[in-house]
């Protein structure tokens, strides 16, 4: 018979009591009061933070936006079809963050940084908060380096610098996205990381952009953040902040980055939808009172960093869609006042065959002039004024029966300048080509070329310089200055091409 020794039993019990881990995991839990339209009202969650991530019973994630006396208003970042009244909600103690790193390049992700391109998981090196503070005054430097878009009209008259915020604004179908995509394509040899944020667009449009970038070899230095029209409003609202966070990672590593928000009108509409469903008081055009702050805190994250901060930069090209050219609506005026200039695209110019359809008279770059390269600044100084005057004269000449010789000459020059600035989509030009084209127009060297042949002249001149005068192209690309020697080479090349074209026309 086994003898039971009480002292051994008591010793074992004492040991087990001592080894017992008394730590208790405390989680902040609430229950769903009401759910629908992408919004949930949650009872409990007394310790919830503003902007905290919530986890619902069916796995759907949400963000706590309204912290009220007796409930929390949350927006759902998913369909939430499995959420039932009375089901539990857990506060995660985390604020929304996104994976960042070199592994993101070439990938298509959603607003939460999850891949949606079917290429598997992303092995990101670290994460960044979606919402983060913009660089302070001391951490910044004034914009002084050019960000070449490859579009002659912009680089010559509305130059954009690294670290600038330049708005692209216009009606639907006027070529806003085309300008943004051309700018990405032009960064191939500029050592720049690009982030394209598609907000509330058709999934087919986003797929088309991805395909264009892949075909032209631009996907390798680009990250695409997509929140298409079928996504919940919360994801459309978050998408621009996600794009900014990814670009910020590279900016603080000393890299030059470019972010395109296409477009912020749809983000504002998504934010309005969320706010109204959360019963926040509406303001002008039913937008909430803080919609200005929604855009200003996003665009202030674009900066040119000081030398001490690593010299990185983040250039922002926000896009806004207007209704019937009305730039005095609420969102357009807000974003115009936040940005450092705007490129205004006109549907009338677009329909008349001018592509890109930039209205030079009301487009402006407030800080880009300091960043413009000397070569193009030297020759393009009068270009914007001449085109603006041409627009006025063209309108006036429709009613005038006879015009003096000087006015006719100005109209003739203006027509040729406008033709010179036409540029097909997906064909950005290098600096040397832009210098040659603008020089030919501004100096009046193509006045003998028929207006309908100016586009052909532009192409012939570029081909002639590439094949016969590569030293001119190399000098402009390297030194960024139009020297007297280079100018004489260019003059000779232009006269050669013009004489050939005039002779063949006769």
UniProtKB/Swiss-Prot annotation:
GO CC terms in record: plasma membrane-derived thylakoid membrane; proton-transporting ATP synthase complex
Cleavable signal peptide: none
Binding site residues for ATP: 170-177
Topology of this chain in the membrane: Peripheral membrane protein
Catalytic activities: ATP + H2O + 4 H(+)(in) = ADP + phosphate + 5 H(+)(out)
Localization: Cellular thylakoid membrane
GO MF annotation terms: ADP binding; ATP binding; proton-transporting ATP synthase activity, rotational mechanism
EC main group: translocase
Alphabetized NCBIfam families for the sequence: atpA, PRK13343.1
Subunit structure, interactors included: F-type ATPases have 2 components, CF(1) - the catalytic core - and CF(0) - the membrane proton channel. CF(1) has five subunits: alpha(3), beta(3), gamma(1), delta(1), epsilon(1). CF(0) has four main subunits: a(1), b(1), b'(1) and c(9-12).
Name used for this protein in its record: ATP synthase subunit alpha
Organism: Synechococcus sp. (strain CC9902)
Lineage: Bacteria, Bacillati, Cyanobacteriota, Cyanophyceae, Synechococcales
